[in-house]
């Protein structure tokens, strides 16, 4: 993965950079871990595993589509993926800088599940600014408190401000000295209708 001449929002000097952000997950339900990725361009791809668990052989990257359009969001973000019942959920940081849920239709297509809300009903924001201060979050869905509901575990960069720029973490809540801070947002709704508490 490389940005090429126009793929990095920080300019041509990053033409050879990729910032691949993979999540290993059984995307197609065949029992083998595949890779679902974000990268420097903000596009999302899947690498299906045609080998085995111990000797994986990945297909070339294939783009993910929603309504026939390439799934696109903020740059340098890792998507979260989880199986919920007989469906697969995918969470990305969308182009409006909000945590956004999609549902797998088939190997290369997803449908829109809407923005993930805070308990207040407001969408969950990610970035502390624009350009290089955007994106960069690494997302995972995991039942942290073992209540049966999937929570958000988030790896951050010092420029993230989750869930909003006024009061978010790690900036401005912790301050400029922070480097990267793992955050937890507990799901106080259900897996069918998620809503999330403020990060801690």
Residue locations for each model-derived region?
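Beta-propeller-forming repeat regions
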Residues: 1-200
């Amino acid at each position: 993965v490389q940005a090429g001449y126009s793929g990095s929002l920080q300019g041509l000097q990053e033409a050879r950079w990729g910032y691949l952000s993979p999540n290993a997950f059984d995307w197609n339900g065949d029992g083998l871990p595949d890779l679902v990725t974000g990268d420097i361009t903000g596009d999302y791809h899947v690498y299906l595993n045609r080998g085995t668990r111990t000797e994986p052989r990945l297909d070339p990257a294939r783009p993910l589509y929603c309504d026939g359009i390439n799934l696109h969001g903020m740059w340098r973000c890792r998507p979260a993926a989880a199986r919920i019942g007989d469906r697969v959920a995918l969470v990305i940081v969308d182009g409006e800088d909000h945590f956004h849920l999609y549902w797998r239709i088939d190997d290369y297509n997803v449908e829109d599940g809407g923005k993930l809300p805070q308990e207040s009903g407001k969408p969950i924001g990610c970035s502390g600014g624009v350009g290089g201060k955007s994106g960069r979050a690494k997302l995972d869905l995991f039942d942290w408190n073992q209540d049966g509901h999937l929570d958000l575990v988030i790896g951050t960069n010092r420029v993230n401000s989750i869930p909003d720029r006024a009061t978010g973490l790690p900036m401005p809540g912790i301050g400029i000295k922070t480097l990267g801070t793992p955050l937890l947002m507990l799901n106080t709704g259900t897996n069918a209708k998620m809503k999330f508490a403020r990060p801690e």
